[in-house]
């Protein structure tokens, strides 16, 4: 939002799951300045919001109507492959840093553990590997919504399960869009992938063939951690290393501990702990205030870590966007 605000020739609409973000995340979006910006909460979870947006992208009538106005839709999340391109870079950066520090011999493999729900960030690591980076295993770290863990272990993707709201909300996803891309690269068959996706849409489940699963497991491993595991990891990392991590990174740390080999492993940290200050405080054994902003101040006082100014000042900004849509209304909003 901030990157595209008030850019000529670009209009921005953001759809996010109502009650599926922290207070800080919500205010980052709802207070965003810019004449070309519109933000909508969607009643439901991330899957409801993303599925609604993907339906709009696939709607030929919407595309035709917008074409008349000289408008073409694009996406800033990983619906758009361009979202993955900058993520590829830090796999190379991390490897080069390790090599320069002597932690790994040039050309020797390094494993990466990635907290993910939509499979985008970890897919960027797969692309880095395909480009020649010596990536060993890509370890997919899930929270209690562990549909990816089950798939990577068994080859069966079954979204017909309870949806859990966790302390790592950006991973609260049951339909992982980017997995479809991996299936295409591994199977080499658009017909197979289309069949699996149609089966998922119709039944909520699909199973890949043994050859496809074997190829996936050559590059990927998986594990999951629940909220209690993550909280324990936040405290352990701070007490042991004085490293303050967020709830998503904590999931990856816990999974990394269970999936270690002799190869060096990099844990990808994907969010600031100050976006989830109440949960981080609670994990550290401190009673958290009701407000995220009071919790942010308490987290700074208790750890010495400084919250980004852009987050500290959010409660002083005007809330510009308050509309809550049903998923079926996303199409109408896109045509406004």
List the predicted regions and their residue ranges.
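PLP-dependent amino-acid enzyme catalytic core
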Residues: 1-336
């Amino acid at each position: 939002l901030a990157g595209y605000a008030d850019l000529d020739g670009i209009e921005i609409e953001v759809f996010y799951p109502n009650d599926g973000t922290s207070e800080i995340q919500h205010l980052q979006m709802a207070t965003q300045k810019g004449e070309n910006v519109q933000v909508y909460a969607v009643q439901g979870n991330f899957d409801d919001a993303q599925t609604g947006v993907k339906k709009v992208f696939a709607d030929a009538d919407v595309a035709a109507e917008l074409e008349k106005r000289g408008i073409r839709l694009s996406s800033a999340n990983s619906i758009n492959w361009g979202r993955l391109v900058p993520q590829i870079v830090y796999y190379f950066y991390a490897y080069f840093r390790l090599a320069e520090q002597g932690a790994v011999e040039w050309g020797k493999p390094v494993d990466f553990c990635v907290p993910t729900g939509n499979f985008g960030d970890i897919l960027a690591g797969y692309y880095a590997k395909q480009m020649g980076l010596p990536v060993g295993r890509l370890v997919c770290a899930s929270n209690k919504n562990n549909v990816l863990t089950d798939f990577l272990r068994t080859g069966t993707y079954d979204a017909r399960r309870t949806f859990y709201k966790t302390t790592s909300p950006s991973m609260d996803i049951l339909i992982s869009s980017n997995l479809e891309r991996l299936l295409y690269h591994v199977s080499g068959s658009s017909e197979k992938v289309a069949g699996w996706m149609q089966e998922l849409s119709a039944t909520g489940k699909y199973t890949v063939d043994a050859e496809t699963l074997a190829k996936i497991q050559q590059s990927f491993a998986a594990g999951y951690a629940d909220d209690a595991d993550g909280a324990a990891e936040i405290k352990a990392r701070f007490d042991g290393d004085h490293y303050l991590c967020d709830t998503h990174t904590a999931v990856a740390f816990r999974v990394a501990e269970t999936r270690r080999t002799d190869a060096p492993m990099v844990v990808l940290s994907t969010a600031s702990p100050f976006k989830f200050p109440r949960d981080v405080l609670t994990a550290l054994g401190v009673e958290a205030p009701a407000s995220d902003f009071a919790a942010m101040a308490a987290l700074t006082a208790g750890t010495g870590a400084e919250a980004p100014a852009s987050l500290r000042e959010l409660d002083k900004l005007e809330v510009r966007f308050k509309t809550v849509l049903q998923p079926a209304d996303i199409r109408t909003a896109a045509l406004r």
